[in-house]
Amino acid sequence: MIFSQGSSPFKGDFSKIKFSIASPESVLAHSRGEVLKPETINYRTFKPERDGLMCEKIFGPTKDWECYCGKYKRVRYKGIICDRCGVEVTMKSVRRERMGHISLAVPVVHTWFFRSVPSKIGALLDLSTKELERIIYYEVYVVINPGDPGEKQGIKKLDRLTEEQYFQIITEYEDNQDLDDDDPAKFVAKMGGEAIHTLLKGLNLDESAVGLRKVLKESGSEQKRADALKRLKVVEAFRKSYEPQKKTRKKPGGLFPEDEMPEPYIFEGNKPEYMVMEVIPVIPPELRPLVPLEGGRFATSDLNDLYRRVIIRNNRLKKLIDIRAPEVILRNEKRMLQEAVDALFDNSRKANAVKTGESNRPLKSLSDALKGKQGRFRQNLLGKRVDYSGRSVIVVGPELKLHECGLPKSMAIELFQPFVIRRLVERGIAKSVKSAKKLIDKKDPIVWDVLEKVIDGRPVLLNRAPTLHRLGIQAFQPTLIEGKAIQIHPLVCTAFNADFDGDQMAVHVPLSQEAQLEASLLMLSSHNLILPQSGKPVTVPSQDMVLGMYYLTKSRIGENGQGNIFYSNEEVLIAHNEERLGLHALVFIKYDGHVEQKFDPVRLLDIISDDESEKKAWLKKEIEAKRLLVTTVGRVIFNQYVPEKIGFVNKVIDKKGAKELISKICSEVGNVQAAEFLDNIKQVGYHYAMKGGLSIGLADAIIPEAKIQLIKKATKESNKILREYNRGTLTENERYNQIVDVWQKVTNLVAEESYQKLRKDRVGFNPLFMMLDSGARGSREQVRQLTGMRGLIARPQKSMSGQPGEIIENPIISNLKEGLTVLEYFVSTHGARKGLSDTSLKTADAGYLTRRLHDVAQDVIVTIDDCGTTRGLHVERSIEEETGGQIKFSDKIRGRVASRDIWDTLKDEIVVPAGGIITEDIADAIQANIGVLEADIRSVLTCEAKQGICSKCYGTNLAVHKIVEIGEAVGVIAAQSIGEPGTQLTLRTFHQGGTAQGGIAETETKAVYEGQVEFENIRTVEQETINEDGMPEVRILVIQKNGRINIVDPDSGKVLKRHDVPHGASLHRSVGDLVKKEDVLFSSEPNSTQIIAELEGYVKFADIEKGVTYKEEVDPQTGYVQHVIINWRSKLRASETREPRIMIVSESGEILKTYPVPIKSNLFVEDNKKVSIGDILAKVPRNLDRVGGDITAGLPKVTELFEARIPSDPAIVSEIDGYVGFGSQRRSSKEIKVKNEFGEEKTYYVQVGKHVLANEGDEVTAGEPLTDGAISPQDILRIQGPNAVQQYLVNEIQKVYQINAGVEISDKHLEVIVRQMLQKVRVEEPGDTELLPGDLIDRTVFIEANTAIAEKVRVIDKGDAPARIQEDQLYKLKEITKLNRELRKNSKSLIVVEPAIQATSHPVLLGITSAALQTESVISAASFQETTKVLTDAAVAGKIDNLLGLKENVIVGKLIPAGTGLKAYRKLELNKVYPEAAEIAVPEVDEAAPASSDDDAAE
């Protein structure tokens, strides 16, 4: 921003900010005078020294309206400049904005521009950073003009010369000195900043650009082209920014009193020589203050020290030049000046940074003041401390309403003091402000009355740190309370993630009318009942409230007064109050409303004795006719509070039920009634938790008798596995996995037993069971450890990678009630402690992930209603849904807009038309209707809005279940929705105490649906074996790697379920079989992949040599010898190679089939032995993911996906459809070829030891992995395109969150982030555009560049065209057509043209960090990371920040362009005078949006 001389800062609003390198003229224009002395203040008078770093003459007075010498005091002398001391009489605040300057004795290079990577100066001059450094620090001379002497000596421009060489030339050609400096014959060589300045000044950028483009086109060397490209980027940046503008620009918005702009403010673009400074600015003294401490010492900003060093060295150098000191001394002083200026601008980048005297820490330079968490951007611009705020400890306020909070009187009086004072003065209670303050200090009783009036209807904001999502700040209506703690409503604790063990919260007072309005309309806690991340309610009763409701609605047979028939609910309540009816008694009530859920009447009729058969028959008839309702007294009490529209809720209410009910109430009757209902059930819950007297004792934890038997059985099984291992039929890996499986199963059985035991205890009224079953506290996992057995424990390791040995195979058999043995206790401490330490470490990681997500998505705002795209996502009903392995179909389409008609194939009708919104109800109906198998929905991923996204592609705003409004900051909401659970999940690990859960490997795969069996891509062999009973049987084994069994609906032919069949599986069904649910389809070996003989013959080993390619492992316990293939590379010479394989040969020795054997395989056959079809030749161990379901493994996975990192050992993926073949074997890799029918062939080299998934002759599709390992998202993008990679990322991230950790996040939030990762394209061929090859640019910028040349043509032959038309240049087609018409008229030769060539590009997948740094906004990127680099690049390119995102607007102090800060809303005016005003188009605003109401409030 520009402060003009003498006048106040301009008030004009600005809409963009341009970055450029400051020219010496602009530095001088901003300066008020030169700082000549290094002194700051006089040690005796403590007043600033004249011409020093704090000088009042330059920077303004230190006291308001008073000059330095005291001649002029008082405001009446405003603007006068004192004739004695030269200080202007003005306010002292100008010392925050007035700048000075230092004129340097020699030019000095700006460290940012030569130390940045790639060096900007180096790129322009084609010098390396090392060489530049030697020139700048006065080590070597650089030739600026070789002249005649240079030519004779063979010296070229830019050659570096040592001192001896330089002096040799100077002495040899003495007459050289007499020539003028600009004489081409003169030899000129210089060093230091001066040399660089001269060289940069002499550059011709246009010529450089042409030369470099030529190299790019013609050079054959990759290295030369890469270098040229690097240099061209910098040259082009300068060229683009340097477009000399006319000097007579009119003032923008009345910036200057004259009609013309004074010269220093005219931006002429960046000249390269500006990177070398002749004057340096001195920032205002109040921004580098000098503060007196007690004891007469001073605390000073480091910048003052750094400036002092510069001034001292500069003055010394000036003196030395004046006295004509010898060159050696001058050179040393110049170097020191260069170093001092370097330290001032960027001290942390230097190896020998300038340190302070006492504490020996590096001084904070100008760059350090901007960088990092403590820098200007993040500390002072993005987060500020605010007044009208306070903080205190929180306690529960059970009697508060949902929208209220209790505010301590002592806090309220401080926060609202100005308003109370005003009220006191207005009402005449106090005469003046001062007396009003006295009244307040005295705590006069009348003050409290006034305070009550003041806070009425004024909401306050409560915030609990860390504020992870928008529900971390909510508005409440304060009520005054005694004491010093803030009271908050128990139901909002979930949103704040607060508890009452000493948490603190901050209170903020919204001041302006608009702020109060927004707080009470948009932020009030009773309006924020729903989580934006999933659309599920967040204000859900917990703990005591749930327990109370559960207890209230539970039924018990044998209660007082059961089986009675009542006419109405009121009768029931009267009978209960008179103690004739027990709370849990089952009764019959006459009812004709809507019932939520019915009991099984048959079971209920059992409560009536058999001799009353008539009554029984009548009851049965009435219940079936739905005239009688069977319910309990407690449910009648509960239903008094349920809104009428919902009907009678007739079921036990647990936490899940409460959540569903609240969700239903919110959507059907609205927030107001929902808030009332919540307050009521809070009261009821607490009341009945108290009435029930529910607490637990040791006796409530019951240990099941069956535990001993189960453990005996498991011990037996594990011994059997050991015996098999000792015989050698199992590998070490299989033994381990099978034993872990056995104990895992037993632990689960014991857990189930103990759970059932608790359920039966006291007819289900065991308090421990009630707490567990209601969802109030505890989990089945904890009950298992209390009353069952602790089970298997994970062995803590740095990373959980699913390797064998991560679970200790000896389980803890005791439970916590019995107590652990010393050894068991010791084993379990490890896991428990690791959980606690993980928690603290991982929270930081989750916080950093959130920050990166915010930065990448902060500028995604809903900008338009409909982008008009026809594209969308295709969603199919997934099969794994039923088994819980995938997200439900309805969850994927809920709240979206259909891009095409959604059909019900069974009824052949449209369920949702194109453009229709899929609401909650429609989504649930579609989920229940199996006729709808797929849907096309609009998605953020395919939105074509130029800026931001459109509301149709986003769908509904999950927090209000209405279509999203224009102006909604969906990017920030997405970042919060993903980041918040990330932090939550990391905090959950320690509750399990490190016990292992999860993967029991299934050996049998069963049908989930009824239907007909179909095979897809399955090859089999038959193996004759003997079964357990000693009878012969035939097993059908699968020998294809990527086979599938599909279950098909026999009528419609639709595939209901697809099962992947592993290699070596044994099939139990054949094609066409009809199967029922739970029928076994196939069984497989979960812990290893088997290599199976497909033919009969003899085994022949190739390259399987003892000690080279395999080793013998002897088990120390059993003495059994295993043959394990090892990595042989280290055993052989460089030229040698091996490829271990098992061949099957016929009797005559002909090779029938070859099987490559991967590293770590166990051999199951011996050389030259006969084998039959189906025999196992070798087993390859498979790692099972077994570690518990905490997100410790999950968070790094999410980070890896968002950062689009290439996995450490990625799978090799086929790029084309075709058939697999194997090529030759090299030393460290073997060749895999994929060939298709068109003759196209791709070759891949696979590292030895990597497991190849494909067999010779297998058919593969593009994108299918050929080897094991994770697939790299970059490969998916390259082979299958952007849509596939977007879907892949969203699905993989969802897997971690929803399936592994059970956290619900809507797909849209992930899509918003993934969209941002694919916003850039890399230019391949620039064609005729201005773009450069390899440029990484925004997709929209690329499209615009192509659109700009779409109507243009290139002139090949200009014919008889006028002189202004040049060959090989671009012109508009219209212009050329017009000229050709004229040329034809005059019978002259025409202009020959060809169409302009468009640029080509490919999409790039960026990780969120690089995407945030590549954002179009300079300010946003600079405040994220790598501040100096971002600012350097922006300045060189003369970039403009259009202030479109949220972050940049916060930094420059404007309203954010989202929500009510949207431009369209800011200009809203309500004119009631003119009838025509109604016709003015204003954006549609929802009733709740306060923007339009602001003016009502103001009027």
Curated annotation (Swiss-Prot):
InterPro entries: DNA-dir_RpoC_beta_prime, DNA-dir_RpoC_beta_prime_bact, RNA_pol_asu, RNA_pol_N, RNA_pol_Rpb1_1, RNA_pol_Rpb1_3, RNA_pol_Rpb1_3_sf, RNA_pol_Rpb1_4. Keywords: DNA-directed RNA polymerase, Magnesium, Metal-binding, Nucleotidyltransferase, Transcription, Transferase, Zinc. Its cofactor is Mg(2+); Zn(2+). Zn(2+) 2 binds at C867, C943, C950, C953. Mg(2+) binds at D499, D501, D503. Binds 1 Mg(2+) ion per subunit. One of its GO terms (molecular function) is zinc ion binding. Gene3D superfamilies: 1.10.132.30, 1.10.150.390, 1.10.1790.20, 1.10.40.90, 2.40.40.20, 2.40.50.100, RNA polymerase II, clamp domain, RNA polymerase Rpb1, domain 3. Its EC number is 2.7.7.6. The keyword Zinc applies. It catalyses: RNA(n) + a ribonucleoside 5'-triphosphate = RNA(n+1) + diphosphate. Pfam families: RNA_pol_Rpb1_1 (PF04997), RNA_pol_Rpb1_2 (PF00623), RNA_pol_Rpb1_3 (PF04983), RNA_pol_Rpb1_4 (PF05000), RNA_pol_Rpb1_5 (PF04998). The RNAP catalytic core consists of 2 alpha, 1 beta, 1 beta' and 1 omega subunit. When a sigma factor is associated with the core the holoenzyme is formed, which can initiate transcription. DNA-dependent RNA polymerase catalyzes the transcription of DNA into RNA using the four ribonucleoside triphosphates as substrates. Belongs to the RNA polymerase beta' chain family. This is DNA-directed RNA polymerase subunit beta'. It comes from Prosthecochloris aestuarii (strain DSM 271 / SK 413). The gene is rpoC.
